[in-house]
Amino acid sequence: MSGVSEPLSRVKVGTLRRPEGPPEPMVVVPVDVEKEDVRILKVCFYSNSFNPGKNFKLVKCTVQTEIQEIITSILLSGRIGPNIQLAECYGLRLKHMKSDEIHWLHPQMTVGEVQDKYECLHVEAEWRYDLQIRYLPEDFMESLKEDRTTLLYFYQQLRNDYMQRYASKVSEGMALQLGCLELRRFFKDMPHNALDKKSNFELLEKEVGLDLFFPKQMQENLKPKQFRKMIQQTFQQYASLREEECVMKFFNTLAGFANIDQETYRCELIQGWNITVDLVIGPKGIRQLTSQDTKPTCLAEFKQIKSIRCLPLEETQAVLQLGIEGAPQSLSIKTSSLAEAENMADLIDGYCRLQGEHKGSLIMHAKKDGEKRNSLPQIPTLNLEARRSHLSESCSIESDIYAEIPDETLRRPGGPQYGVAREEVVLNRILGEGFFGEVYEGVYTNHKGEKINVAVKTCKKDCTQDNKEKFMSEAVIMKNLDHPHIVKLIGIIEEEPTWIIMELYPYGELGHYLERNKNSLKVPTLVLYTLQICKAMAYLESINCVHRDIAVRNILVASPECVKLGDFGLSRYIEDEDYYKASVTRLPIKWMSPESINFRRFTTASDVWMFAVCMWEILSFGKQPFFWLENKDVIGVLEKGDRLPKPELCPPVLYTLMTRCWDYDPSDRPRFTELVCSLSDIYQMEKDIAIEQERNARYRPPKILEPTTFQEPPPKPSRPKYRPPPQTNLLAPKLQFQVPEGLCASSPTLTSPMEYPSPVNSLHTPPLHRHNVFKRHSMREEDFIRPSSREEAQQLWEAEKIKMKQVLERQQKQMVEDSQWLRREERCLDPMVYMNDKSPLTPEKEAGYTEFTGPPQKPPRLGAQSIQPTANLDRTDDLVYHNVMTLVEAVLELKNKLGQLPPEDYVVVVKNVGLNLRKLIGSVDDLLPSLPASSRTEIEGTQKLLNKDLAELINKMKLAQQNAVTSLSEDCKRQMLTASHTLAVDAKNLLDAVDQAKVVANLAHPPAE
């Protein structure tokens, strides 16, 4: 049908929230209507869901139901959004999918008339009903700001029309702007620099698809790298825009290319002779356009129109006659078809209702008896609230008028029946209030007569139909779950008011339980809770279900040793798909993974992230994650690599496991099956540690109780004598007992040969007095031997003071020797010392201890590298030596500045090291041709080793930056220093290799005297 302007539409973009008002209205179907007169219309509309089952609504009606009733019922249902003020802007379009034939349905037409007039022309399944915005206010930009739902709906409609009709025709610059505006609006929580990350952009490309935002032709014409850079740069320009600002910017940009507020029809004006014109109909009235270069000429304003009539002509043509106030004759417009004339008539009539004083229809129809009527009955003038009230009063609660196509992915066959009679449940006190309604404590009497304490979730009476479906979706999912650590569903009452009945757990939410009992809960118990929730999540993983809301507030405590996961209101089955795309805006941002915040993408991997946050909550005794941040700031922190800090009582191995779960790349996170094994090991380890600590607490070391006869402190008992084991060790006969070094230093009596009689002469040892040694009979306090008198206690006290003085003197000596050893080790770690020192190091003698030879040389620590002195050669014009020294200075600068620099400046000092290394390797490459071939292999190998050292230093730097705010920060800095030291040592080894090769080639000279 030529000349018919197809309205704008789009299916998959938008952000529409459901209202929280009165219940959804219903189109009343009289009880006495025969079955053949009942119809079910599938009306498509625009929504934010990628699930096709969410983009339409089935409306049950009769052949006598008017189109206006269907439109109003959908608007009041809340399916497209809340608080619609401009209801008169909406219309219903009937479109034939195979031929693009279009019919705009007048509000006063009945369903029966539509079927008799239009649907009979083609197969019924080939027709589609679309809810569209067709009539716009005069200043629609400002008017739509007052009605956010209509604004977003019109935007979605326009976006769809742009992608279908204009995207391939606009310039690349405009296509880039419009695509990035939609990116900013659609991913409104994404930070401005999110697309700079390669992983984020790949996720957008593969999982979401650039086809939603940019025309395919543009993607094919540009190189991928160039296209990506253009998107990143353009996106930065719109990063600060809010959703409404993106929409308005889109309108203004596209308006420069196409008319977004009017429809154009190619037709003929009949004025004695026929003039072919483009008739432009929009908020400004009816205008004609004779050529593209001229301005439109106004033919009539909508306030001037008094009547509209369509008359068929021969050869499928038709005439549209408009009666205009003050004009001697009507304005006659000749169209190519009757359908086109009727579509124009509906458009003009709609604008007359919107802008004119007369709210009824101006279209005149011929009756069967030949009589004319001036107009059809007026459309009811009730506003939305009054009509909502009127419809609610006229509808029966039990009537089954609206029915969504059931989501079969949420309804699984088999399993027990959960229907419960309301009289079997008695409600008691209110436990709390949820999003949908109150939660009650109650008692359920089952078929055996047993009384069971239950929790009853209720749904508010004024909840919309869509929210009721969401409320019931939790029960639908819980029907299929059976796990010892998942809340058990008892039953469902689907009749109004809807109830969901579940097990009652007296200890309540885990978050409150942790806060109340934080002084008594031990670490093994906390780890046990995490293990149990992990097992529940592994079960959900096995049935392809994502939870999306794992937090302590959604975990219930069944007993002090058992917790259960609940609240499946956000859960979804993902079936064979890899992920679930969220369409709601009420999401727990501080618990979510980066891909969930940026792209609303939920997978098992995002559940792993949330589970790790939940573990952090448990080990923090219920603290909220990122409680020091606002929701909008969380993604920026995560993008920088920052993570939650280690809780005080969290075992380091468990925190390491958490950080693995917080990997930015979802594919690098562990699965729940792996986490169950790891947590089981950690739990067993913590249990063993707790048992050992308890055993140590029971067996305390011996102590002397204070005598009651005096108030002075009692003397400390001397340490029990150690008797070595007999030499009949069956496992290792030659193995001797060795006292640990740390114990020797603090307890010299244990290693004194005078006080360790051998098994041979121990029988001839003279008996010891009571005040010299206390023999310990048991570890109980009441068995300790008390001194018999104050004098004996005083002697013990003096003897202990003498021994303590000897211990302190011996420890001071050892401290001096240890400090000397530490200084030598520090000199070993400083490459500058060995490169400039031409004599081997010797232990220094400390004044006052000349006779003391010191302890034997301690073995080198693991990882310490042996550094030899640099050759004593003439270094004049020696670029290799000069560059090595410069590199070492850069390493020392890194060592000295690392503690004071912020993490973002680490790259400056590391870059300085890298530049100096490049100069060093360049100078060696210049010298290499003059060196013997036999030496080149070693030199080239050392060069490769230096490159690896630099790569390791860079990796350690990145690790230190990522963990700057965590408890691992200092450890990461130490690793960074170790990597830099290794690089400096290998640089010195390269210098030695070059010096040796120069000696072989007779290129080296001794230093000038």
UniProtKB/Swiss-Prot annotation:
Comp. bias regions, Pro residues: 712-727
Regulation: Activated in response to stimuli that lead to increased intracellular Ca(2+) levels; this activation is indirect and may be mediated by calcium-mediated production of reactive oxygen species (ROS). Activated by autophosphorylation at Tyr-402; this creates a binding site for SRC family kinases and leads to phosphorylation at additional tyrosine residues. Phosphorylation at Tyr-402, Tyr-579 and Tyr-580 is required for optimal kinase activity.
Annotated EC: 2.7.10.2
UniProtKB keywords: Adaptive immunity, Angiogenesis, ATP-binding, Cell junction, Cell membrane, Cell projection, Cytoplasm, Immunity, Kinase, Membrane, Nucleotide-binding, Nucleus, Phosphoprotein, Transferase, Tyrosine-protein kinase
GO cellular-component term (any): dendrite
Region described as Interaction with TGFB1I1: spans on this chain: 801-1009
UniProt modified residues of type Phosphoserine: 361, 375, 399, 762, 839, 866
Protein kinase domain location: 425-683
Active-site residues, Swiss-Prot/TrEMBL: 549
Modified residues (Phosphothreonine): 765, 842
Positions of modified residues (Phosphotyrosine): 402, 579-580, 722, 834, 849, 881
Alphabetized SUPFAM superfamilies for the sequence: FAT domain of focal adhesion kinase, PH domain-like, Protein kinase-like (PK-like), Second domain of FERM, Ubiquitin-like
Organism domain of life: Eukaryota
Intracellular or extracellular location(s): Cytoplasm; Cytoplasm, Perinuclear region; Cell membrane; Cell junction, Focal adhesion
Name of protein: Protein-tyrosine kinase 2-beta
Organism: Mus musculus
Gene: Ptk2b
